[in-house]
Amino acid sequence: MLLASAVVVWEWLNEHGRWRPYSPAVSHHIEAVVRAGPRAGGSVVLGQVDSRLAPYIIDLQSMNQFRQDTGTLRPVRRNYYDPSSAPGKGVVWEWENDNGSWTPYDMEVGITIQHAYEKQHPWIDLTSIGFSYVIDFNTMGQINRQTQRQRRVRRRLDLIYPMVTGTLPKAQSWPVSPGPATSPPMSPCSCPQCVLVMSVKAAVVNGSTGPLQLPVTRKNMPPPGVVKLPPLPGSGAKPLDSTGTIRGPLKTAPSQVIRRQASSMPTGTTMGSPASPPGPNSKTGRVALATLNRTNLQRLAIAQSRVLIASGVPTVPVKNLNGSSPVNPALAGITGILMSAAGLPVCLTRPPKLVLHPPPVSKSEIKSIPGVSNTSRKTTKKQAKKGKTPEEVLKKYLQKVRHPPDEDCTICMERLTAPSGYKGPQPTVKPDLVGKLSRCGHVYHIYCLVAMYNNGNKDGSLQCPTCKTIYGVKTGTQPPGKMEYHLIPHSLPGHPDCKTIRIIYSIPPGIQGPEHPNPGKSFSARGFPRHCYLPDSEKGRKVLKLLLVAWDRRLIFAIGTSSTTGESDTVIWNEVHHKTEFGSNLTGHGYPDANYLDNVLAELAAQGISEDSTAQEKD
């Protein structure tokens, strides 16, 4: 065992034998489930934190990621890195792919690039870690040494990965990416994890058909191109170590990875566009199912049955000796295969009824809600705030710091005792001024805070990038629409003693404004009007009043890419969950749900909306 502090990065093994990191948000979610222990069920539903990963479940006992619609299994691991490395600072390095979107580098590649960047080297050669690329920090470009093709790279900030302190386990059984040539070979293990990992690596080495044909060293790096660029910088320097060749006046330090292998029994990203785990074409899943024992298969089957109902499709109960669990009919066969492999008898029964809407209600039965004025609200286009510069806005929330602490500004990653490293359009403040946010006490270059404010919604509010404390009144970019609300004389499941509050949202399609992702481009509005339901209880009315505040602040909806259909430039929910299923809970968006009201209050509070905050605003 090793006593140390480290950041935890959860990673999955792709079909080319490379470990790909989950985003910081996903890693935090997995760690939370691990800390919850047996009461969490031993499985992690990734779609709960990232809707793009809705098909995936992680089984913490077998350390496998399970794709519900195909049955594909991928090994996962819990890896530790130095807190001073990129994941410990929330730094993400990404390259621009052919579609114009950004793909994060493998974690150890990103750490190597960040280390060179912090040492102020002009460029770094990645050849010695298996990639024929040069990263030029002056142009923020990646150059293919063979074809001279250049792509843009970027460095951005995200959440810091979860931190652990104390006793960390030593390297465990299963193999990972090969280390230096001098490292002695590890003896193979016969556990399911090792068998699965070795089958993936063997397929890569043997050049199997399908996606496994791609070379290991080219995965997660841009494909070669044909663009001819000027000659590379001088290459007289010799490689310094196996973690990356850095061309520049300073020597590189060893890799900042604490350990390259993870425990099979854990003890403790968005990145913007995270590379999603591979889809149905992989052969790994077929190999992996044969490696799991009855207990693991049974646990995966139960976890899948519990989660698939959130897909929104009418369900088919799959019965076994212990009862029944509903699953998506298109996926019931997958569950049946898993349960049969676990030795459980399987049969299909008639699906329960999906009840999306209440019984018909006449106009005379619709009543206003006691204590809530009116029965509808409208929002129009955003009104620009006039007369206040970013510097004037920030002045309300900041205290100047005459003697800055000797630590990094987490926006530009330069020392607070040095000028800001921000290189964009020049704010009017001096780059060496430092300020402390009044409530949370976090310290930044004022220059960096002004730049961050200018890149945001410019609504007079500020959110601390470290702890997410909101200063001022946060507003969103919700397009114009209407919100109606009233009482109907029916009860929700789980709330038999009260009527129901029905909310109807109506947003028409239109043209995106300057605050939206693609100004001047049209946006769609699918599924409107949207009907949502709350119990007419004291807490239900409290939620409604706060939802009205969120609506007025344009925080209920946004314009983006639908996680359900993949359509871009469309109206989507904005992190405040609503119940759209009236009389059942087959989709996961209905009742009964004992925790829903508390959960939505927490989501609203994260947007700066609570009874206390609204009372302070009125004062």
UniProtKB/Swiss-Prot annotation:
It is found in: Cytoplasm. Keywords: Cytoplasm, Metal-binding, Notch signaling pathway, Repeat, Transferase, Ubl conjugation pathway, Zinc, Zinc-finger. Pathway: Protein modification; protein ubiquitination. Residues 378-387 have a biased composition (Basic residues). One of its GO terms (biological process) is protein K48-linked ubiquitination. One of its GO terms (molecular function) is ubiquitin-protein transferase activity. GO terms for cellular component: centrosome; cytoplasm; cytosol; nucleoplasm. Its main location: cytoplasm. InterPro entries: Deltex_C, Deltex_C_sf, Deltex_fam, WWE-dom_subgr, WWE_dom, WWE_dom_sf, Znf_C3HC4_RING-type, Znf_RING. Residues 238-281, 358-389 are annotated as: Disordered. Pfam families: DTC (PF18102), WWE (PF02825), zf-C3HC4 (PF00097). Residues 1-78, 79-155 form the WWE domain. PROSITE patterns: WWE (PS50918), ZF_RING_2 (PS50089). Residues 261-273 have a biased composition (Polar residues). Its EC number is 2.3.2.27. It catalyses: S-ubiquitinyl-[E2 ubiquitin-conjugating enzyme]-L-cysteine + [acceptor protein]-L-lysine = [E2 ubiquitin-conjugating enzyme]-L-cysteine + N(6)-ubiquitinyl-[acceptor protein]-L-lysine. A zinc finger (RING-type) spans 409-468. Interacts with NLRP4. Belongs to the Deltex family. Regulator of Notch signaling, a signaling pathway involved in cell-cell communications that regulates a broad spectrum of cell-fate determinations. Functions as a ubiquitin ligase protein in vivo, mediating 'Lys48'-linked polyubiquitination and promoting degradation of TBK1, targeting to TBK1 requires interaction with NLRP4. The WWE domains are thought to mediate some protein-protein interaction, and are frequently found in ubiquitin ligases. This is E3 ubiquitin-protein ligase DTX4. It comes from Homo sapiens. The lineage of its organism: Eukaryota, Metazoa, Chordata, Craniata, Vertebrata. The gene is DTX4.
